[in-house]
Amino acid sequence: MSASAQHSQAQQQQQQKSCNCDLLLWRNPVQTGKYFGGSLLALLILKKVNLITFFLKVAYTILFTTGSIEFVSKLFLGQGLITKYGPKECPNIAGFIKPHIDEALKQLPVFQAHIRKTVFAQVPKHTFKTAVALFLLHKFFSWFSIWTIVFVADIFTFTLPVIYHSYKHEIDATVAQGVEISKQKTQEFSQMACEKTKPYLDKVESKLGPISNLVKSKTAPVSSTAGPQTASTSKLAADVPLEPESKAYTSSAQVMPEVPQHEPSTTQEFNVDELSNELKKSTKNLQNELEKNNA
């Protein structure tokens, strides 16, 4: 039973969506025309009629009418017609509104959390985006009245879906082409801005002097400094002579190690000056490579 109920609910939702699409796509021109004409008529009434005075006039007219009928009927008939034939119970507005209010209250904490994060700049990027959006809305509503915006939105709601559905492929191709052109233009403008600002940045860097060098040395990636060091150490390791490999001898009786016939050679003296010169040369090469990588 639960599965059938869920299936029926899904069908109802799909039918509602299809009805809304059919309404906006003018599948039934008579029904769509009624809604479109009614919305335009309501907007024209809102523009021409002062709603506050209108509702006040309707309210005091109803009260004067019901009071007069009740008084006259009690005076001549002995019983008030309004109290006799009027509704005895009020419509259950609270029961109708309560589910919607409960659903809205469930979503309220999430909305409050988003507002708190935005106001207190937990993510500054999102805060700036929201500020820019509110600024644009402020300018937009200062240029146009609310009635004009609602009137244009109503016309677009009943015309744009039908136009897009009729020329979908052409509109999609045009939008994709416009996006590509905008990307190219933004890249060109960014490159132009970089080229124009480069001389000023170079001047600032030259004026700062050692401060800019210090910042570069701190912000340089580790890989750029590790590369020359490993290369120089590998060069130093290549310059150092390796010890000769010892010959492997088998334990068989046929192959025996030869007895040395000559006297052992004397040990060579260790020259400290040559070693210090080599170390100085290697450090100079390392400094040159580091300067080239930083430049």
UniProtKB/Swiss-Prot annotation:
The chain crosses the membrane at residues 51-73, 143-163. The modification Phosphoserine is found at S232. One of its GO terms (cellular component) is cytoplasmic side of endoplasmic reticulum membrane. Residues 265-295 form a coiled coil. GO terms for biological process: endoplasmic reticulum inheritance; endoplasmic reticulum organization; endoplasmic reticulum tubular network maintenance; endoplasmic reticulum tubular network organization; ER-dependent peroxisome organization; nuclear pore complex assembly; response to bacterium; response to endoplasmic reticulum stress. InterPro entries: Reticulon, Reticulon-like. Residues 20-220 form the Reticulon domain. It is found in: Endoplasmic reticulum membrane. It is a multi-pass membrane protein. Residues 74-142 are lumenal. The keyword NAD does not apply. Residues 219-295 are annotated as: Disordered. The keyword Transcription does not apply. Residues 219-235 have a biased composition (Polar residues). PROSITE patterns: RETICULON. The modification Phosphothreonine is found at T186, T219. Keywords: Coiled coil, Endoplasmic reticulum, Membrane, Phosphoprotein, Transmembrane, Transmembrane helix. Present with 37105 molecules/cell in log phase SD medium. Interacts with POM33. This is Reticulon-like protein 1. It comes from Saccharomyces cerevisiae (strain ATCC 204508 / S288c) (Baker's yeast).
